[in-house]
C-alpha cells in the first residue's frame, strides 16, 4: 500500500445529524486506523478535510487562507463534523510529528458533480430536486449569501496532484476563487 486517500466521513448535514456517532468515529477512530495503516506500510496519505474547520463564513466575504484557524461552536449539533474535521487534522499533524508519516491535508470546499444523492441535504441536489418538483429554492442565510463551488473532477485532479508532490506543502484549500451570489 503506497498511497491512502482518506475520505471516509458523511458530508451532508442530514447524514451527520442522523449519524452523529458514526461521523465522530470517522473523524477520530477512522483517521487513526488509516494513519496506523500508513505507518505499518510506510504509505503516503491524503486526508480529506473541509472548509468547515474555519467556522461560519464572515459576512464581509473574507477568504480564509490555510494559516488561519477559524472559530467553531464546539457543542453544536454539527460539531461531530465541524470539530471532528479539526480534530482529524490534529491527529494527522501529530502522526507526522511523532512518526514522520507523510500526510497531506486537503480542505475541500462546497463540491458538486454527477451522482450526488438526491434528498440528502446538499445545496446543489436540493436546488435541482426542488426545481423539478416546482418547489421554492430554499437558501439558508439571506440575500447576501455567497458561496464558491468546486467540481468533483477538479477536486480529484487536485488531490492526485497533492499526493504526487515531492514535499508536503501543508494544508491546501480546494475551492474556487469565484463567489456566486445564490440569489442570482
Name every feature range the model reports, one short phrase each.
Residues 29, 33-37, 149, 154-157, ...:
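Conserved mid-core alpha-helix of short-chain dehydrogenase/reductase
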Residues 58, 86, 111-126, 135, ...:
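Glycine/proline-rich active-site loop of Rossmann-fold NAD(P)-dependent oxidoreductases
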Residues 1-109:
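N-terminal Rossmann-like NAD(P)+-binding domain of SDR-like oxidoreductases, especially those catalyzing
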Residues 38, 96, 131, 139, ...:
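Hydrophobic pocket-lining residues that define ligand/cofactor binding sites across diverse proteins
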Residues 105, 149, 179:
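Short aromatic/basic micro-patch
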Residues 73, 144-145:
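Catalytic Tyr-x(3-8)-Lys segment
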Amino acid at each position: 500500500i503506497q498511497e491512502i486517500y482518506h475520505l471516509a466521513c458523511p458530508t451532508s448535514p442530514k447524514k451527520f445529524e442522523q449519524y452523529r456517532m458514526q461521523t465522530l468515529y470517522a473523524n477520530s477512530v477512522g483517521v487513526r486506523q488509516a494513519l496506523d495503516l500508513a505507518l505499518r506500510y510506510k504509505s503516503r496519505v491524503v486526508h480529506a478535510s473541509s472548509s468547515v474547520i474555519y467556522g461560519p463564513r464572515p459576512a464581509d466575504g473574507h477568504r480564509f487562507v490555510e494559516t488561519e484557524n477559524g472559530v467553531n461552536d464546539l457543542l453544536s449539533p454539527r460539531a461531530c463534523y465541524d470539530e471532528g474535521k479539526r480534530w482529524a487534522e490534529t491527529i494527522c499533524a501529530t502522526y507526522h510529528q511523532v512518526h514522520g508519516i507523510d500526510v497531506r491535508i486537503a480542505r475541500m470546499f462546497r463540491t458538486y458533480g454527477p451522482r450526488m444523492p438526491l434528498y440528502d441535504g446538499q445545496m446543489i441536489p436540493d436546488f435541482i430536486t426542488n426545481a423539478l418538483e416546482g418547489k421554492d429554492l430554499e437558501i439558508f442565510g439571506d440575500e447576501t449569501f455567497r458561496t464558491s463551488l468546486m467540481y468533483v473532477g477538479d477536486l480529484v485532479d487536485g488531490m492526485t496532484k497533492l499526493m504526487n508532490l515531492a514535499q508536503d506543502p501543508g494544508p491546501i484549500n480546494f475551492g474556487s476563487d469565484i463567489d456566486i451570489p445564490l440569489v442570482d
